[in-house]
Regions:
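Active-site acidic/histidine clusters and adjacent loop/turn architecture
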Residues: 2, 13-26
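Amphipathic alpha-helical segments
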Residues: 22-39
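Charged, low-complexity intrinsically disordered regions
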Residues: 3-11, 40-55, 60, 68-217
């Protein structure tokens, strides 16, 4: 599937207007039918955020615009979090193409960088605040191997649940270079994009739980 591109005018970033605000606030509207009793709110950036049950598990979905990295095009990150506790020792963050400018993540605060096991995607860096062995490595590596690494930015396994950070849109290169047009989110996110990400997190969470279960016999 082709990545969504911005279609705003050359000075859209200077004149937000009602249409831009409405598009951002309604960016997740097409995804609402996926959830049971969803709670929709608008974040400080103006983009929608959803919390609700999906297939019996609690999810939080938010959208984060990113225009701080001067070497990259402005983009939108989709943060999808399955908020169900896990019996793990700490937070395990696998970051793709780390730049140090990932303001949406606690990756930069984690002090313990671990060797990347065989089978993980190229360009992956792993950090944790836990000590000793990290038993989720095989599960995490298998999960990441099934994803489009060009869009994948981060996967987190933590006591509070699991998260994937996904690239859903970036600014049109020509417009941005010529006019600095960085308008994003004009087209709403579809359920066809979000549902597979949530399904994948359900599987990842279940696999981590299974790996943490006591072994008998």
């Amino acid at each position: 599937m082709e990545m969504a591109r911005s279609t705003g005018g050359p000075f859209a970033f200077l004149r937000p207007g009602a249409a831009r605000a409405a598009a951002r606030a309604g960016y997740l509207d097409l995804c609402l039918p996926l959830f049971e009793q969803p709670i929709m709110r608008v974040s400080d950036t103006g983009f929608a955020r959803i919390s609700g049950q999906y297939k019996g598990q609690m999810f939080d979905v938010q959208v984060v615009p990113d225009s701080l990295n001067l070497r990259k095009l402005p983009c939108l990150w989709l943060l999808v979090t399955l908020v169900e506790r896990l019996p793990v020792a700490g937070s395990y963050n696998a970051m793709m193409r780390a730049t140090g400018a990932e303001t949406f993540s606690k990756f930069g605060d984690l002090q313990n960088q671990v060797a990347v096991p065989v089978g993980f995607p190229e360009g992956c860096t792993i950090r944790t605040d836990a000590v000793g062995d990290w038993p989720v490595s095989a599960v995490l590596g298998g999960y990441m191997a099934g994803l489009d690494t060009a869009r994948l930015k981060e996967v987190v396994v933590a006591k509070t649940g699991v998260r994937v950070v996904w690239l859903v849109e970036e600014a049109d290169r020509g417009r941005y270079l010529l006019f600095r047009d960085a308008e994003l989110g004009a087209q709403a996110l579809t359920a066809a994009v979000l549902a597979p990400l949530m399904d994948g997190l359900c599987g990842l969470w279940a696999d981590v739980m299974a790996g943490a279960a006591p072994k008998h016999g």
